[in-house]
């Protein structure tokens, strides 16, 4: 059975994130990120090197967990949690990635601190089905 472009792109993004965030294999990660990678995040220096340098500078305890991934043609959105990066609370992010020629070519994100039970006006967690900690 043939995969749709959306299925292929979701798998590509998850493989790329695992290679960079978990394995920290920068040489292998180069095959996933375009050398002309465009970075729109206000939190990350420009280009592929900006992202790779950010991860190099992050503590070894950095962890990324995705919860939801959706795709529309060459765009993939991943809802995830970054933890172990230093601040007392995790970050919840929606990462939007554009794929071009089988590589991550462009990135946008929205990041917020993970809500704690006492600060969640909705009474619901911002990631997963339960509060952490």
Name each region found by the language model:
Residues 1-133:
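C-terminal and inter-domain tail/linker signature
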């Amino acid at each position: 059975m043939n995969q749709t472009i959306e299925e292929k792109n979701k798998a590509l993004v998850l493989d790329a994130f695992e290679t960079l965030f978990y394995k920290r294999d920068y040489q292998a990660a180069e095959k996933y990120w375009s050398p002309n990678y465009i970075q729109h995040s206000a939190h990350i220096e420009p280009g592929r090197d900006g992202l790779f340098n950010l991860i190099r500078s992050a503590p070894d305890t950095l962890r990324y967990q995705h919860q939801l991934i959706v795709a529309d043609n060459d765009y993939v959105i991943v809802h995830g949690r970054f933890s172990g990066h230093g601040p007392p609370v995790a970050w919840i992010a929606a990462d939007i990635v554009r794929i071009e020629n089988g590589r991550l070519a462009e990135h946008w994100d929205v990041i917020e601190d993970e809500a704690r039970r006492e600060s969640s006006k909705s009474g619901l967690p911002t990631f997963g089905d339960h509060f952490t900690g």
